[in-house]
Design a protein with these regions (language model features):
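Short, low-complexity N-terminal intrinsically disordered segments enriched in polar/charged residues
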Residues: 1-37, 41, 141-145
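A beta-strand edge to alpha-helix "cap/lid" segment located at domain peripheries
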Residues: 2-11, 67-145
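A solvent-exposed, acidic/Ser-Thr-rich amphipathic alpha-helical stretch
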Residues: 13, 32-34, 38-91
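Short charge-dense sequence patches
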Residues: 14-26, 60-66, 121, 126
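Short hydrophobic/aromatic segments of transmembrane alpha-helices and their interfaces
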Residues: 17, 48-49, 105-106
Length: 145
């Protein structure tokens, strides 16, 4: 089995494992540029945050829109987030994980995140599914800091 590493010299067994760890690390640092670099040039993001943050009624496409999206997410996301994750599922090209997350008010929101990687190990498609409580949080504008 081949191994990959990132800039911190951590060794990963696959592109999926590398993306999983690098993506979560970049998100925790609010690093929109590092997040965007993990996406294919023509990648697509589908998330309930797209219409909420960008006012679009369609998925976002391409690195320019993806960078704008992650900058908006970074500006609105709470500094302290509690995640309770237990790993991920993969078939080698698709990466999926589910986790509950605590809101700034202390409520629990549930998410499922799905990434499809291309042949170059970049994210081609990213979809986020929110549990029912999450939509109320968006509607009440309680997602931000």
């Amino acid at each position: 089995m081949s191994q990959e590493s990132n800039s911190s010299s951590q060794v990963f067994s696959s592109p999926v494992e590398r993306i999983y760890h690098a993506w979560n690390d970049a998100l925790s640092r609010n690093d929109a540029e590092a997040l965007t670099a993990m996406y294919a040039p023509d990648a697509i993001i589908e998330s309930p945050l797209v219409p909420y943050l960008m006012g679009l009624e369609r998925p976002i496409r391409g690195r320019e829109e993806i960078l704008a999206f992650w900058k908006l997410v970074a500006a609105r996301k709470p500094n302290i987030r509690q995640y309770y994750r237990t790993g991920y599922l993969t078939d080698g090209k698709k990466l999926m994980w589910e986790y509950p997350r605590e809101t700034p008010a202390g409520d629990q929101m549930d998410f499922v995140e799905v990434m499809e990687l291309n042949e170059n190990g970049l994210i081609q498609r990213y979809r986020v599914y929110w549990g029912w409580f999450g939509f109320g949080v968006l509607k009440r504008d309680e997602y931000h800091r």
